Amino acid sequence: VIGGAECDINEHPSLALIYSTSMRFHCAGTLLNQEWVSFTMWDKDIMLIRTLCAGVLEGGKDTCLAHPCAQPLLPAFYTKVFDYIPWIK
């Protein structure tokens, strides 16, 4: 599923974001295949330290085209991978 529409097998991974404006932690899951999902949870205060925010807080502009992208107060975030190279290796 990409933006609510089906996609071809192995075309794109699917990312599901679970959040609440009142919660401190956010959770996301990436569908790896029919049997495996990779989940992550992060503290929204800490994630601001090593991330790049893409989009504007007013909404309407973001880096993706699928729903619910470009929503007010929910910009896209990208991780600075360089800081995690030792852990990745």
Curated annotation (Swiss-Prot):
Q: In which tissues is it expressed?
A: Expressed by the venom gland.
Covalent S-S links between cysteines: C64-C69
Tell me which residues this entry annotates as catalytic: D45
Gene3D superfamilies annotated for this entry? Trypsin-like serine proteases
Which compartments is it annotated to reside in?
Answer: Secreted
Q: Name one GO molecular function term.
A: toxin activity
Q: Name one GO biological process term.
A: regulation of blood pressure
Listed A to Z, the keywords are: Disulfide bond, Fibrinolytic toxin, Glycoprotein, Hemostasis impairing toxin, Hydrolase, Hypotensive agent, Protease, Secreted, Serine protease, Toxin
The family annotation for this protein states: Belongs to the peptidase S1 family. Snake venom subfamily.
Q: What is its EC number?
A: 3.4.21.-
Task of the protein: Snake venom serine protease that cleaves fibrinogen alpha and beta chains (FGA and FGB), but not gamma chains. Exhibits fibrinolytic and kininogenolytic. Preferentially cleaves after Arg and Lys residues.
GO cellular component terms, alphabetically, are: extracellular region
Which ranges carry the Peptidase S1 domain? Answer: 1-89
Q: What else is known?
A: Negative results: does not have clotting activities. Does not stimulate platelet aggregation. Does not act on plasminogen.
Q: Which InterPro entries match?
A: Peptidase_S1_PA (IPR009003), Peptidase_S1_PA_chymotrypsin (IPR043504)
Q: Which residues form the signal peptide?
A: none
Species of origin reads Bitis rhinoceros
| UniProt note: pH dependence | Optimum pH is 7.4.
Question: Does the keyword section mention Protease?
Answer: yes
The protein's name is Snake venom serine protease rhinocerase
- Modification comment: Glycosylated.
Activity control, as annotated, is: Inhibited by PMSF. Not inhibited by benzamidine.
**Thermoactivity:** Optimum temperature is 37 degrees Celsius.
